[in-house]
């Protein structure tokens, strides 16, 4: 998003919006923000004051499909969860197949206020941040003992880079293959660390044998739970 669009959105923050629909009409009419950019901002919880991102995305898709139209096919009503009786107050006339000359803005404002979606999971939020920001910004005491998997290397004993969702720090750790294979982890997974231990680092010597490196320590996770449904 360029500086012009950022300034336009910042100016809108001076306004009071009673609903997400109010904001969408202003974004559409008063700014140069493109649809894909708006979707990204919703994904990143830029408009969280209006509700959960999944609900806002669903509302935005419907807004895009209907806001510039003046008529609706009767066959479309079921797909948007509206009966003919509910749509009737917003149309000037009706034919066998069409609802014509609709007051689409009033219709949409009413319709969007009723739309709900399954709440966004923590994993969905993390996935969006990594995709669009390139990093995770979550830092919350509620997530004590929980981490997101940033990198996975399974060449030898699985090696992970984890992001602490409590304090925003990253750490490197390992898991033995037997434990890992019982609950395989992928980039973006969320886990609660239940048990850990420290072990010396190892490296290959000149004979190709693995030996411990004196005075070193590595963190090994010995028990964890995957929490992707949060």
Question: Whereabouts are the PLM-identified features?
Answer:
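Noncatalytic, beta-rich nucleic-acid-contacting surfaces in large DNA/RNA-processing enzymes
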Residues: 1-230
